[in-house]
Curated annotation (Swiss-Prot):
This is Kexstatin-1. Belongs to the protease inhibitor I16 (SSI) family. Its main location: secreted. Keywords: Disulfide bond, Protease inhibitor, Secreted, Serine protease inhibitor, Signal.
Length: 145
């Protein structure tokens, strides 16, 4: 009788083990996590009063995301993303723009910064303008907030 009970228990264990293995094999596999279709573009832009990034007091900060669509707390995300795409994300090209407008020669420095990721590449940029007038001329849309 002991042998029969042991054989039945062993048989039941084998059947249940086989069913559990089969059930696990039949379960659908979880899809592999893949990245998005677009390289990430997420930026934090700031404007601060001061002569350098290290000493400036941040007055305003906004977020800007350009992929897959323009969005963020920037007042004109579409315009800012369009301006950045036109220069392939080169912030120097934006801040070095020229204009026919004239500004006073006062020294009241403003520092603009951009930190984050532009089309998958890390960005850490800062530029010091002599005054607000020069900043508004040169930075057209991206730092105009």
């Amino acid at each position: 009788m002991r042998y029969i009970t042991g054989a039945v228990a062993l048989g039941a264990a084998l059947v249940l083990g086989t069913l559990a293995t089969t059930a696990q094999a039949a379960a659908p596999a979880q899809p592999a996590r893949t990245g998005g279709l677009y390289a990430p573009t997420e930026l934090v832009l700031t404007v601060g009063q001061g002569e350098s990034r290290a000493t400036a007091t941040v007055q305003r900060a906004v977020t800007l995301s350009c992929m897959p669509g323009a969005r963020g707390s920037h007042p004109n995300p579409l315009g800012a993303c369009t301006q950045l795409r036109a220069v392939a994300g080169d912030f120097n090209a934006i801040t070095a723009a020229t204009s026919d407008r004239l500004c006073t020669k006062e020294w009241n420095p403003l520092v603009v910064t951009a930190d984050g990721v532009w089309q998958g590449k890390r960005v850490s940029y800062s530029y010091t303008f002599a005054n607000r007038c020069e900043m508004n001329i040169d930075s057209d849309t991206v730092f105009n907030f």
